Amino acid sequence: MIERIWSGQSRLYWLLLPLSWLYGLITFLIRQSYRLGWRKSWRSPVPIVVVGNLTAGGNGKTPVVIWLVEQLQRRGYRVGVVSRGYGGKAERYPLLLNESVTTVQAGDEPVLIFQRTGAPVAVAPRRAEAVSALLARHTLDVVITDDGLQHYALARDIELVVIDGMRRFGNGWWLPAGPMRERESRLASVDAVVVNGGVPQTNEIGMTLTAGMAVNLLSGESRSLSQLYDVVAMAGIGHPPRFFATLRDAGVSIAREVAFADHQSYQPEQLALLTQDTMQPLLMTEKDAVKCKAFAQDNWWYLPVDAVLAEPQGTQLLDKLEDMLNRNVGSRT
């Protein structure tokens, strides 16, 4: 129902407009309080790059974070990542990730980023504390914050916004009547806009998600998607239909699609019942896999995806980031 309301297919949004106006007023006042100096933002001794979004729900932000970390690493930068750690509950914060930290503690996205990139990752509700914890343990050139565009308590040097190119901004209303955390006009003040799917507009950078080979959760074996038949596809992400569409575009034979809530907590029995027998493949997102690996069965597979930014815009973005990072580093010395 909420997707229908947010997409503009239902007029029931007007029932939620009073709450949306209140949400919009509060977010406006919070941002103004920092812009006018009534509240102080903490500035890191190293440059901060925010990768965020204007809307609730999955936009493909985490693949962009992974892409950015890997690209900057290839250029010789020492990169750290901080996150709110949504969906996790640690005994204390800030929490620095290592091989023994679970998604229950840190949340699924930070664990995924840590495993994919090998970059130092820290989580904390107050991102400034996460940044400080990283810098106390690691020598870094730049810190990327996964989400946090609206977290103005942390000063930032560069802002990237990721947009779902198919859904864009829905009906345009603030939460909860619409999907907006901030109005579309906020894009005028960010450094780059990356559009996941759809048709990019002027000054937007197109992006696609490219599927790799399916990987078995238990053995680590890789197989071509064409080798998996009659699969049960499951996704507990912000927008599950995107994952299912990726599978269909790759020609995967799907027997059933099962959508779960974002940051879903899974039980072994719950997932074991999804397949008819141990021979039928269960294919999930990589984000789900980091939560399910501990109790995986032989027929469970995940599909890693990589963000691919349009060229030459992708390279131009990296060049721009590198130039800005170098200038910011110089200004801090």
Curated annotation (Swiss-Prot):
An example Gene Ontology molecular-function term: ATP binding
Pathway(s) this gene product operates in, as recorded in its UniProt entry: Glycolipid biosynthesis; lipid IV(A) biosynthesis; lipid IV(A) from (3R)-3-hydroxytetradecanoyl-[acyl-carrier-protein] and UDP-N-acetyl-alpha-D-glucosamine: step 6/6
Catalytic reaction(s) noted: a lipid A disaccharide + ATP = a lipid IVA + ADP + H(+)
Keywords tagged on the record: ATP-binding, Kinase, Lipid A biosynthesis, Lipid biosynthesis, Lipid metabolism, Nucleotide-binding, Transferase
A GO term from the CC aspect: plasma membrane
Residues bound to ATP: 55-62
GO BP: lipid A biosynthetic process; lipopolysaccharide core region biosynthetic process
NCBIfam families with a match to the protein in the record: lpxK
Protein's recorded name: Tetraacyldisaccharide 4'-kinase
Species: Pectobacterium atrosepticum (strain SCRI 1043 / ATCC BAA-672) (Erwinia carotovora subsp. atroseptica)
Gene: lpxK
